[in-house]
């Protein structure tokens, strides 16, 4: 699919730059691997259930209302990422720099690599650049203007944002005890090193071209190509895959909203509300698909019909009866009262 889009978008490769071929090949492989892993991820019973229910709830309610709510979720989860700000202001700024720097870099790089965007100078004035998108001229600007500065330095801006995010992330990982205890090199440190290599080598191209008179440009260009290719190949298999999983989390927000507004499930033991009926029913179905049987013989048909506090109480009571035989904790001389929700455990043999 990506290959077809490259051919069509570049007008049968007419505007495709062969010097960017390694980037294009790595992008094609990365897209195929991401699509395969995403399809496998969606086949997991819990993920599949959330996915199906999320789309059903989106189309089931008012389309306009749900579209507005989806737009608000996109703004909160992707543009501002306020859910991270509630945890830590440092992590919020760090994620904003990394996410916006990465999105800006991909928004500029991929259309250029695929040949969807190309530049040309006017025939009558070589100081004026024309911007073509899918072969259609959309803008032109003269060299030395603000538009030229912003266009030609977009990747530099993204690299600076990424470097700031990396610095904040390293500061957190070197100073917070929790991060130090849980971090792993392959999952937490390696992605930062790869991002640093891409951003630093990209800025190195600008430094070489503008201030070093092209000295070392070929070596830096090869290094940058190698680091970008490695990053693209790493996308489907490492921590960066959560970037593609994140949009699916928006369906969970629809699910939670419907669960709060819908009928609630009542505990079979204390008869208190503890979750939505939809969530309990979905959980039962997922457990069946995972080959877990939590059905009970008694007044309560299924273990998931019991609220978490009662589950803890039942566990303690039945363990006490099993270990001590009499009383709740072996101190009460009265015979134990069987709980109607769970079968009595077999007494230990003497």
List the predicted regions and their residue ranges:
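Membrane-embedded alpha-helical bundles of multi-pass integral membrane proteins
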Residues: 1-265, 314
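Zinc-coordinating Cys/His ligand positions in small cysteine/histidine-rich zinc-finger domains
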Residues: 95, 304-307
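Short cysteine/histidine-rich metal-coordination sites, predominantly Zn2+-binding motifs
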Residues: 251, 282-293, 322-330
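Short metal-coordination and nucleic-acid-contact micro-motifs, chiefly zinc-binding Cys/His arrays
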Residues: 262-266, 300-303
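Short cysteine-rich clusters marking metal-coordination/redox-active sites
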Residues: 267-271, 307-310
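Short functional micro-motifs and their immediate structural scaffolds
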Residues: 272-279, 312-319
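Short recognition patches in nucleic-acid-associated and regulatory proteins
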Residues: 273-301
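Short polybasic linear motifs
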Residues: 329, 334-336, 341, 346-348
């Amino acid at each position: 699919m990506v290959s077809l889009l490259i051919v069509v978008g570049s007008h049968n490769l007419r505007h495709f730059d062969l010097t960017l071929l390694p980037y294009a090949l790595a992008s094609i492989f990365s897209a195929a691997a991401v699509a395969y892993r995403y399809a496998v991820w969606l086949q997991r019973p819990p993920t599949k259930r959330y996915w199906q229910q999320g789309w059903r709830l989106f189309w089931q309610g008012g389309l306009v209302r749900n579209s507005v709510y989806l737009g608000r979720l996109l703004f909160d989860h992707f543009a501002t990422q306020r859910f991270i700000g509630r945890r830590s202001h440092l992590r919020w700024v760090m994620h904003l720099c990394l996410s916006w720097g990465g999105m800006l870099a991909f928004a500029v790089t991929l259309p250029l690599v695929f040949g969807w965007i190309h530049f040309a100078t006017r025939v009558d004035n070589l100081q004026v650049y024309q911007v073509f998108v899918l072969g259609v001229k959309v803008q032109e600007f003269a060299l030395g203007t603000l538009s030229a500065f912003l266009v030609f330095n977009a990747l530099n801006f993204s690299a600076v944002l990424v470097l700031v995010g990396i610095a904040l992330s390293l500061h957190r990982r070197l100073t917070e005890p929790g991060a130090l205890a849980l971090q792993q090199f392959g999952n937490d440190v390696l992605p930062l090193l790869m991002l640093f290599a891409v951003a630093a080598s990209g800025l190195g191209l600008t430094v070489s071209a503008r201030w070093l008179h092209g000295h070392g440009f070929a070596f830096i260009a090869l290094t940058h190509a190698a680091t970008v290719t490695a990053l693209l190949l790493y996308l489907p298999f490492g921590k960066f895959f959560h970037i593609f999983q994140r949009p699916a989390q928006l369906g969970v927000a629809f699910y939670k909203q419907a669960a709060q507004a819908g009928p609630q499930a009542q505990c079979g033991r204390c008869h208190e509300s503890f979750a939505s009926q939809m969530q309990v029913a979905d959980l039962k179905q997922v457990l069946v698909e995972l080959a877990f049987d939590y059905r009970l013989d008694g007044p309560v048909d299924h273990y998931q019909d019991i609220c978490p506090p009662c589950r803890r109480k039942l566990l303690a009571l039945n363990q006490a009866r099993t270990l001590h035989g009499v009383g709740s904790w072996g101190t009460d001389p009265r015979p134990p009262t069987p709980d109607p929700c769970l079968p009595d455990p077999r007494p230990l043999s003497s």
